[in-house]
Design a protein with these regions (language model features):
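Juxtamembrane intracellular "pre-TM" segments in multi-pass secondary transporters
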Residues: 2-6, 185-218
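Conserved MFS/SLC helix-loop-helix module at the cytosolic interface between two early adjacent transmembrane helices
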Residues: 61-99
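Helix-to-loop junctions at the C-terminal end of transmembrane segments
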Residues: 63-74, 262-275
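Helix-loop-helix hairpin linking two adjacent transmembrane segments in secondary transporters
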Residues: 101, 138-185, 234
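Cytoplasmic helix-loop-helix junction between adjacent transmembrane helices
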Residues: 105-143
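Intracellular juxtamembrane helix-capping segments at the cytosolic ends
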Residues: 115-127, 316-329
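C-terminal transmembrane helical hairpin of 12-TM major facilitator-type secondary transporters
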Residues: 277-321
Length: 347
């Protein structure tokens, strides 16, 4: 069992969001510089094309095999170690002599970057019950900002300093995140420091079986995430077919995801005051309205309005569902987070 006696100040909550932004950005840096990497390794196109996928596979592996450890290992130490591995992985990417080596460090980057998903349940544990939703929303804003920043900043740095400069920048920012971790995270004590790792993994199945609210929240989120993903799968083809637009316009529309950064803390605060169920209903209504707009308002303006509604709705439901699962089992928040995130990404 864990002793969570510390409370986070608003400044520390904001800093946790910044840490999450930094580490998540490292996952997405490679997506905007693949063409530059391919130029350095013209005979390894196959390996270069695997880099984004392998990074995401590493993230999935980290979600399943590393995040549950936060219920048993002192979280500050675990977060610090993962951040240190992430720093070394970014250095490895910068120095990679071949694309194959780059693929290996991409996997390591994805796995270590799940440190962000160690931080979210930690923030929930250290927040006041009456402000848990707002805290989770603020930290998740950092995660969302990291996704956008990784793609945008990666491309900008790559244009002037090359792809190695991008990964060097990621390493430097990760070093800054490590400094913040050392400064702001309190040490927490565990009353049961010994554990069986296989038993930890087996307990995931028991939690899924015994916690119906977890099943409801995760399955709801998986279905809505699938709805969200469908749009971004077909949007580039629709824009190219109907308007002959390229990737630049798709990227500009993706930047509308900034609305999610603004919605997350608001959704968390609403969940604290009114309960997460109402926030879930509100978010689902927004997403249904978004698809109605896509269907009836077949234009670029309609697409913009629909994207704003869809993104806002998805984030509202996400934060509300996280509020629900983090309120269930204080001793199992990391494992519940593993179930939630893994099932969501399957959707």
């Amino acid at each position: 069992m864990r002793s969570d006696n510390h409370e986070l100040s608003s400044t520390r909550i904001l800093m946790l969001g910044i840490i999450c932004c930094i580490v998540v950005a490292n996952i997405y840096f490679n997506q905007s510089v693949l063409n530059l990497i391919a130029g350095s390794f013209p005979n390894e196109w196959g390996a270069v094309s695997l880099i984004p996928m392998v990074t995401q596979v590493g993230y999935a592996v980290g979600l399943f095999f590393l995040i549950p450890l936060g219920d048993y290992i002192e979280r500050q130490r675990l977060i610090l170690r993962q951040a240190q591995v992430l720093f070394l992985a970014m250095i490895g990417m910068m120095l990679s002599p071949t694309a194959t080596v780059l693929v290996f460090f991409s996997f390591l980057t994805g796995m270590a970057a799940t440190v962000a998903q160690q931080i979210v349940p930690l923030a929930a544990s250290l927040s006041r019950t009456s402000a848990r939703g707002k805290t989770v929303g603020t930290v998740m804003s950092g995660v969302l900002a990291g996704i956008l920043a990784g793609r945008a900043i990666g491309g900008l740095i790559g244009q002037y300093f090359g792809w190695r400069g991008v990964f060097l920048s990621g390493a430097i920012m990760t070093l800054l995140a490590i400094f913040f971790i050392l400064r702001i995270l309190p040490t927490q004590s565990l009353s049961t420091p010994k554990f069986n790792y296989l038993a930890v993994l087996r307990s995931l199945g028991l939690l899924w079986k015994n916690e119906p609210q977890v099943r409801g929240a995760t399955l709801t989120q998986a279905m809505l995430f699938a709805s969200f993903s469908v749009l971004w799968t077909v949007l580039p083809f629709w824009l190219a077919y109907r308007y002959d637009y390229g990737a630049g316009i798709t990227g500009a529309l993706a930047a509308l995801g900034l609305i999610g950064i603004l919605c997350a803390p608001l959704a968390g605060s609403f969940s604290d005051r009114q309960g997460p169920f109402r926030m879930v209903v509100f978010g689902v209504i927004l997403m249904l309205l978004a698809w109605t707009v896509f269907w009836r308002w077949n234009s670029i303006v309609g697409m913009v309005v629909g994207i704003l509604l869809l993104d806002a709705g998805e984030q509202c439901v996400l934060i509300a569902n996280q509020h629900t699962i983090y309120s269930l089992r204080p001793d199992a928040r990391n494992r519940l987070n593993t179930l939630f995130m893994c099932v969501m990404f399957i959707g």
